[in-house]
């Protein structure tokens, strides 16, 4: 079955889906954002097959969202967010806010974010609920929330 090429549509949402629309891609970006930068770490956290993870990482590197950097002599590689990828974290944070509001359940959100600028705990959002400052990749520490289980 041929996948639709969203990248050629005259729509920014469709073009963004062409980059992160595969089911594992947003979760891989989330993992890299929270500090799982090595293949084995990402695979262990997500439980995704090596083949699928390899394909997704290659796609995200090819699209300029992740950068592949050697970290050992073998060589082995880790994956880091590029500027383009760090800005996609803002999209993920909007998804977190929606999911926390509509899908978290009685226990509450599974993840909380400590904003570096003010030190306060905030939920997933583009702005800190306490100081109102923007929250981007690198501006927060990720902590287990009450719904982490």
Predicted regions, residues:
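Residues within the DNA-recognition helix of helix-turn-helix
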Residues: 56
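Alpha-helical linker/hinge and terminal dimerization helices associated
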Residues: 26, 63, 91-102
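N-terminal helix-turn-helix DNA-binding core of bacterial DNA-binding proteins
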Residues: 11-49
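Beta-hairpin "wing" of winged helix-turn-helix
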Residues: 61-77
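C-terminal regulatory/oligomerization modules of transcriptional regulators
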Residues: 100-149
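Basic, amphipathic "hinge/linker" alpha-helix immediately C-terminal to the N-terminal HTH DNA-binding motif
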Residues: 21, 72-94
């Amino acid at each position: 079955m041929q996948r639709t090429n969203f990248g050629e549509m005259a729509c920014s949402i469709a073009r963004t889906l062409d980059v992160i629309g595969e089911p594992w891609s947003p979760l891989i970006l989330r993992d890299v954002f929270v500090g799982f930068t090595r293949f084995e770490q990402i695979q262990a956290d997500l439980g995704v097959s090596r083949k699928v993870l390899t394909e997704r990482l290659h796609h995200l590197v090819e699209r300029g969202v992740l950068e592949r950097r050697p970290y050992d002599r073998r060589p082995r590689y880790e994956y880091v967010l590029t500027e383009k990828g760090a800005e996609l974290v803002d999209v993920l944070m909007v998804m977190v806010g929606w999911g926390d509001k509509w899908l978290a359940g009685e226990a509450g959100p599974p993840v909380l974010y400590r904003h570096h600028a003010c030190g306060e705990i905030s939920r997933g959002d583009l702005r800190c609920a306490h100081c109102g400052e923007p929250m981007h990749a690198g501006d927060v520490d990720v902590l287990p929330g009450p719904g982490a289980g």
